[in-house]
Amino acid sequence: MMGLAKTLLLASQLTAVVVATPTINNDNELTTKWPVCVKPTKVLDERIPTVKRGPVETPLPTQPGMVNNCNKFCWVQAGNKCYQVAMENHISLADFLKWNPGAGSDCRTLWANTYACVGVSKK
């Protein structure tokens, strides 16, 4: 059984999560496909961080080594493989590996939870 102090602490932490997470509706249900804030920051910003890299802004984070002329990006989820990402974006595996050399020639070093390049502009 939890003591009163622990119960109050847990309640205050849960309230902070609900306040900082606008994807929780009035019935305290999470809206699907939206991130949940578990530790609020000083600035709550919904924009995806980007960096200017060539002709377009590149969303962050990315795996090191991505080509500079990338103009189309795909979020790599845990469990994704290079071939799967390439096929879903209608590009060849060879192009995917050329544009994302950090994934390795055998795709063993593809990072999850990063953006990968799935399209390039002509240099």
Curated annotation (Swiss-Prot):
Occurrences of domain LysM (ranges): 72-118
UniProt-listed InterPro entries: LysM1-like, LysM_dom, LysM_dom_sf
Entry keyword set: Chitin-binding, Signal, Virulence
GO molecular function: chitin binding
Annotated signal sequence range: 1-20
Induction data: Expressed constitutively with no significant difference during colonization of banana roots.
More details: In plants, chitin acts as a microbe-associated molecular pattern (MAMP) that is recognized by lysin motif (LysM)-containing plant cell surface-localized pattern recognition receptors (PRRs) that activate a plethora of downstream immune responses.
PANTHER family per the UniProt record, alphabetical: AM15, LYSM DOMAIN-CONTAINING PROTEIN-RELATED
Domain writeup: The LysM (lysin motif) domains are small globular domains involved in binding chitin in eukaryotes. Lys1 contains one LysM domain.
Stated family: Belongs to the secreted LysM effector family.
Function: Might have a role in sequestration of chitin oligosaccharides (breakdown products of fungal cell walls that are released during invasion and act as triggers of host immunity) to dampen host defense.
Name of the protein in question: Secreted LysM effector Lys1
Organism (species): Pochonia chlamydosporia (strain 123)
Protein's gene: Lys1
